[in-house]
């Protein structure tokens, strides 16, 4: 079983914690990671883009000038694509970009992302994380103790004081463990997670 240090909010190690090898010590599957990240980003797209083709643009029903004898290039409609205010060739239309990923692949990707954080030494486990009131200064001091800059912080439950303490800090995101996803794990350089959140992850993915 992989073992990592257990720290308090001040950045001092208070012990060690053993992680479940079925979650934090698996073979990293880069293909699954890629597939899941692509799907997550695709599913975020609104798909509301739209433009008019030459058949949908208003006007242009009459030939702008006769075919021959003017010395100008022949034209059939002022709404042809080459005209200003003309239609768009292969105009984008609203569409659904949603991609479906099998549950088994999502689980493999999640375990791979968590394992990569442990392997890279970028995972910090906190004994607990709580603030009586939102305190950005204290939060910054905690991050400095772990030399954390671009950081994802995962808590066991939604904590308003913790969230408000971090929301104005650039490159830092706080999410409850129920909202964890592969993209965020890979996007942020360091992962700071509470002991209770680790237990919840192991319950679901072990």
From Swiss-Prot:
Disulfide bond found in the keyword field = no
| Cellular component terms per the entry's GO annotation | ribonucleoprotein complex; ribosome
Q: Where is this region: Disordered?
A: 49-76
Q: Check the record and name the Pfam families matching this protein.
A: Ribosomal_L4 (PF00573)
What are the TM regions of this chain, as residue ranges? Answer: none
Give a GO biological-process term. translation
Q: Which UniProt keywords apply?
A: Ribonucleoprotein, Ribosomal protein, RNA-binding, rRNA-binding
A GO molecular-function annotation? rRNA binding
Q: Which InterPro entries match?
A: Ribosomal_uL4, Ribosomal_uL4-like, Ribosomal_uL4_dom_sf
Can you state the subunit structure given in the record? Answer: Part of the 50S ribosomal subunit.
Among PANTHER family, the record links this protein to: 50S RIBOSOMAL PROTEIN L4, LARGE RIBOSOMAL SUBUNIT PROTEIN UL4M
Tell me which family the UniProt entry assigns to this protein: Belongs to the universal ribosomal protein uL4 family.
Role according to the record: One of the primary rRNA binding proteins, this protein initially binds near the 5'-end of the 23S rRNA. It is important during the early stages of 50S assembly. It makes multiple contacts with different domains of the 23S rRNA in the assembled 50S subunit and ribosome. Forms part of the polypeptide exit tunnel.
Q: What is this protein called?
A: Large ribosomal subunit protein uL4
Species of origin:
Clostridium botulinum (strain Eklund 17B / Type B)
The gene behind this protein is rplD
